[in-house]
Amino acid sequence: MEKAYRIKKNEDFQKIYKNGKSVANRQFIIYRQKNSENEHFRLGISVSKKIGNAVTRNRIKRAIRESFTKHKEDIIKDDFIVIARQPSKEMTTNEINKSLEHVMKIAKGFNKRIT
């Protein structure tokens, strides 16, 4: 995923936490904030140290990025922050993808219906 698609600055994270809407399931929390300035979506990922060691956290982050890259054309041009919860550490990449699709449908983060 290219740098233009990433949210890195703390002030951007804080703005989205404060003004964005949140949706959650057992594995993930997604904050979504409208951003008409961008021509594509932006993604921030947060995986706490409580979830596991660096290898585990990076595996989860890679799976989240892969899921968003897979649906790049279908995602609304907003800012998203994905926070991983404890149950996500036992999940496979495919299960993470399905769980994120579920939460994004609830958050109405897709342009069209995803099957």
Curated annotation (Swiss-Prot):
Sample GO molecular function, one term: ribonuclease P activity
- Group of enzyme by EC: hydrolase
Q: Would the keyword Hydrolase turn up in this protein's UniProt record?
A: yes
Q: InterPro entries attached here?
A: Ribosomal_Su5_D2-typ_SF, Ribsml_uS5_D2-typ_fold_subgr, RNase_P, RNase_P_CS
Catalytic reactions on record: Endonucleolytic cleavage of RNA, removing 5'-extranucleotides from tRNA precursor
GO terms (BP aspect): tRNA 5'-leader removal
| GO cellular component terms, semicolon-separated | ribonuclease P complex
**This protein's UniProt keywords:** Endonuclease, Hydrolase, Nuclease, RNA-binding, tRNA processing
Q: What is its EC number?
A: 3.1.26.5
Family of this protein: Belongs to the RnpA family.
On assembly, the entry states:
Consists of a catalytic RNA component (M1 or rnpB) and a protein subunit.
Provide the function of this protein.
RNaseP catalyzes the removal of the 5'-leader sequence from pre-tRNA to produce the mature 5'-terminus. It can also cleave other RNA substrates such as 4.5S RNA. The protein component plays an auxiliary but essential role in vivo by binding to the 5'-leader sequence and broadening the substrate specificity of the ribozyme.
According to UniProt, the name of this protein is Ribonuclease P protein component
Species the sequence originates in? Macrococcus caseolyticus (strain JCSC5402) (Macrococcoides caseolyticum)
Gene that produces this protein: rnpA
